Every structure is written in C-alpha cells, then in structure tokens.
Amino acid sequence: MTTPRAQEATAASAYPRRFRRAEERGRRIGRILRRVAGVRHVDEELLDRIGRRMYARDEPGAALVRAMRRDGRPGAERVTMAQFERALREGVQAVPDAPPELVRFFSLVDAVPAWVDFDLVERGAGVIRRLGRTASDVLLQLSLIGGYRFGGPAELLVATGGLSGATAMRRLGETETWSNAVARPGGLRRDGEGFRLTVHVRVMHALVNDRFEHNGRWDVHEWGLPVNQSDLAGTLGLFNSTLLLGARALGWWVSAADARAVMHLWKYVGLLLGVDEDWLFDTEREQNVFNYHVLLAQDGQTPAGADLTEAILKGQRRLSEARSNRLRAAYARARLLGMLRCFLGRQSLEELRIPVTLPWAVPPVLVRNLAASLLLGRTEHGRQLLERAGERFRDRRGALLFAGARPRVGPLPL
C-alpha cells in the first residue's frame, strides 16, 4: 500500500531530488572502495533500482503498523502493543485470537529460510565478539559518523530529536546494545535477544516511517520515504562489509572464512529487518559493489550531518572526562580524532566540522590489533581470551553510554 504523498512523489519523478545530486563527491569518497570491490564500470541498472527504492518501504512492517494505529479499526483486527510484545517473546501462537496482521507478520519473521546456516551465524558472531573495541571503533567512526556525510538519513535523525549530546549518546548506546545482542552466542535463535531486538528495530523503523509519511514534516519529493529500502540496505552494508574493511584498516587480520561468516550473520539480520532479499549478499565483494553504487546515489553534506557529528563528539568527550584523568581523556580524544582522520580524510572532516589532527595515536592501535589477531587469534585459547576481553569492553562501554543504567533499545514510538 502506497500513501497519497508517496504516490504523488513517485508520479512526479521516479527518484527523489537527492538521488545522484553529489555523484562526483561520492566517487571521491568511494575511491578506495571501488578498488577493493573491483568495480570497473558503473552499473546504471543497479543505480536506477537504488533511486526507485528510495520510494519503497518494508511493506510487511508497514501493514503491521497500520494495524497498530488507533484509527477506529475493529478490535479483532487492531494489534495492540501488548499483543505484539507477547508474540515477540513467546511466539504468535501464545496470543489469544491473534489479529490477522500480527499472524502474517510473525509468519514471515519466524520462518527460517533454507539458506540460513546457524553454525555459520555462530562463527560470524564469534568473529565480531573477538573484534571487541575495534568493532566499536569502526561502527562509530566509519559507519555512523561516516554516514553523516550524506543528506537524507541525517535529516530524519535530527527530525526525531537526535541533536543533544545526551540523546546522541543514548542512541549510540541503543545501537551498540542491539549489535552486541546480535553477536552473542545463540543471539539470533528464535529465543535469542538478538532476534527479538532485531524485530523490535524493524517495527520501530516502520512506526517512524509511518509517522513521518503522514505528519507533514517530511519532504518525500526531496528525500524519498523517511525509512526506505535503499537506505535500509545501505545501512546494513555499514555493519557487514564496512565493519570488515574498517577492522582490516586498523590492523585486524580477518580470514576469508571468517569474513564469509560475518556476512552470513548480517544477511540473516537483514532479512529480519525487512531488507529486500535481492539486496542481501553472501560475499564482501557483492556488498562492496553495492555500497559503492549507494555512494554514487547520495546527496552531499547537509548541516544535519555536521550537527549530529558535533553532538556525538561532545558526548564522547564528556564520557572520557567523566571516567578518566585529564591526560587519559586527552589521549582518548586524540585517538578518536586520529582514527576519523584515517577513515574519512581531511576533506570530509572539514565538511563535518571535525578538528583535523595528526593521527599519531593510531599506529599503536595497528600494532596491538595485528598482534592480537595474528597471535592470539590463531589458537582456541587465544580466541577465548579475545572474546572475554571483548565482552569486558562491551560491558564497560554500555555502563558508560547508559550512565550505569541497564543497556536497552528504546521503546516503540506508537
């Protein structure tokens, strides 16, 4: 079902105005990615699909949300939050007289495709757990802040109230809580926290999309749908192949078999999130080719991205100063700014209003990661040590991001 505003926008143009508006900038940012992925020619058909799917949503999620809205729907058809939460915890069969849309939605997310190999999922989860702080570094600096370089998703984050330092850090904590749950042993089994939080995030996306499609605060002609298939698939790419690319850039050795396992884990997560199945990839190369074309499809830098970056950096500084002496806090900031310089480059830092510094704190990180992955990572005992170290780091980080409260993902904004 397409809303009148989305129909009107699609009738006016096959693509929103932001599509390919800063293509040369995308080429510059994606130079290394293009070489890594072996892209020789731009796939115009793929770019066309990316542009068109800026007007496409997660339809099963949207149908569930329509049934959750208080719009005079008969009681037997309307889905309550209590019914959704019980179905998520216990299965839809545990909901008495479950409404049809609730049954349809959970029949999709509960169905495990034949291609899902849970042994491979568990191997991928172990790789992510061993990455520990390196995974957090990459997801914050390359995936999150790197994603603020483009208009569209950044505007939605600002519109939903992400500009205060406290809110920015809470959202970062919620994202890390979810990604950590996905990587726990058994996390993506039906009774795992990673499964439950992923489905929760999917419905949260659908609720936000529904709200901003209808409240008159979102320019569909400019940006496409608030939460659309192209942005969803692009975001998924920040958690799989971008994580691997960034970890290697920081000195972490990842074998081809381990990389395939990480890709497989996130392929299943993408399915649960409602990403179109033809954009769920098995290999790094396929994902990197897609990611490169996503870069070409993007808009340029907008004020929203720089404002979000400022909020994150202020929040990170407050965390460092609260838990460390002045010298350690200064090192933490130098480490963060140095990695951002390496990942994003001077020009992107200037566009995001990030101080440009010499990355002197990065070489020790490279040495440490090389030693950890090449020495400890080669034995079972060493891998167990890395997993435990990663778990301790995640516990400390969660306590900081949530100021001592229990880490969690935000409630559904019904």
Segments the model singles out, each with a brief description of its role:
Residues 1-236, 240-414:
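Mature, function-bearing regions of proteins
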